[in-house]
UniProtKB/Swiss-Prot annotation:
It comes from Ovis aries. GO terms for cellular component: extracellular space. This is Plasminogen. The lineage of its organism: Eukaryota, Metazoa, Chordata, Craniata, Vertebrata. The gene is PLG. SMART domains: KR, Tryp_SPc. Keywords: Blood coagulation, Disulfide bond, Fibrinolysis, Hemostasis, Hydrolase, Kringle, Phosphoprotein, Protease, Repeat, Secreted, Serine protease, Tissue remodeling, Zymogen. Disulfide bonds join C15-C94, C36-C77, C65-C89, C140-C156, C232-C299, C262-C278, C289-C317.
Amino acid sequence: APQAPSVENPPEADCMLGIGKGYRGKKATTVAGVPCQEWAAQEPHRHGIFTPETNPRAGLEKNYCRNPDGDVNGPWCYTTNPRKLFDYCDIPQCESSFDCGKPKVEPKKCPARVVGGCVATPHSWPWQVSLRRRSREHFCGGTLISPEWVLTAAHCLDSILGPSFYTVILGAHYEMAREASVQEIPVSRLFLEPSRADIALLKLSSPAVITDEVIPACLPSPNYVVADKTVCYITGWGETQGTFGVGRLKEARLPVIENKVCNRYEYLNGRVKSTELCAGDLAGGTDSCQGDSGGPLVCFEKDKYILQGVTSWGLGCARPNKPGVYVRVSTYVPWIEETMRRY
């Protein structure tokens, strides 16, 4: 089951976040409409595990529905029906309110493609996704763009395998992904961009719970072109060629290089399409490498980070005169929005 992070439920709200472990509302009837038994009472049902004494922090007051044991089905209570020990309660999910592209933790923005970048401040890029196969190893990056959708590179996916082979990890800083903030959610559907661009959408089997460590990035306006020399950031756990910080999320700042310049003979020599963008140090030394395929290139605009690129390809890794190439997300916003709306 997906690990539910510890999220603060709004005080007294009659709605729940995630599986409702933090629910402290006043619902006191089961789905069948039967009143709940008081947690402190021993009639009609005798019980010793979940009482206000044994679980003083679980909010077991009166006979309100609660989820003291983190049951995946949500809040429950002992019932006043002598023939039914316990039952679940019908509590709606809270509307998740979040601002896309606004981390709760300020990013380091280290000067220096991720080979020569630096270790990120934990959870400062809260839309960063680690894509895993059944083997559990990180093999590609991705970006959370709404509670139920992740954008990644098409070349990361093997369409023969189908969605059940993939899981996304959210809220991680360490590649091992064992922190309490981690949410692990199976993928339910894969959508490859129809014109065969190197971009794909993953629908999650259940929505991510938006927390301080898990926040979507914003999508750009359709067909927006990032100006030359705009400073943007890439993040990932990828191949770092013996450089420092393996296993922790890394970041690097990169200037965008306009296509006209990037396609010059001495750089990428006409290989970059208008639906792609270049970013990198023409001197070499920083770049996103294998293993960060599918990960984000975000640019700060006004007061938020906007996903402008999906890491796609590069010639080698952090080589002089060979900037990284990213899918230009703005080109595909109509397809992204249409797919999210239809499915």
